[in-house]
């Protein structure tokens, strides 16, 4: 067995980043919910 999580900054931000969230309606809803909840960090 090997470690399955091998982090990459670029891949992470491409998939879960702010700009990706802003692209879609549902993504904007995610940001809205996280703002309402008072999250310090909205996205990865």
UniProtKB/Swiss-Prot annotation:
Gene Ontology cellular-component annotations: ribonucleoprotein complex; ribosome
Keyword presence, Ribosomal protein: yes
Biological processes, Gene Ontology terms: translation
Record carries keyword Ribonucleoprotein: yes
Alphabetized Gene3D superfamilies for the sequence: 1.10.287.3980
Start and end residues of each stretch annotated as Disordered: 1-44
Keywords, ordered alphabetically: Ribonucleoprotein, Ribosomal protein
Transmembrane portions of the chain: none
One MF term in the entry's GO annotations: structural constituent of ribosome
Database matches in InterPro entries: Ribosomal_bL34, Ribosomal_bL34_CS
Recorded superkingdom: Bacteria
Biased composition (Basic residues): 7-44
One Pfam family from the record: Ribosomal_L34
Recorded family membership: Belongs to the bacterial ribosomal protein bL34 family.
Name of protein: Large ribosomal subunit protein bL34
Gene responsible for this protein: rpmH
């Amino acid at each position: 067995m090997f470690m399955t999580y091998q982090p990459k900054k670029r891949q992470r931000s491409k998939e879960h980043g702010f700009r990706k969230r802003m692209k879609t309606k549902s993504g904007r809803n995610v940001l809205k919910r996280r703002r309402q909840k008072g999250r310090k960090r909205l996205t990865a």
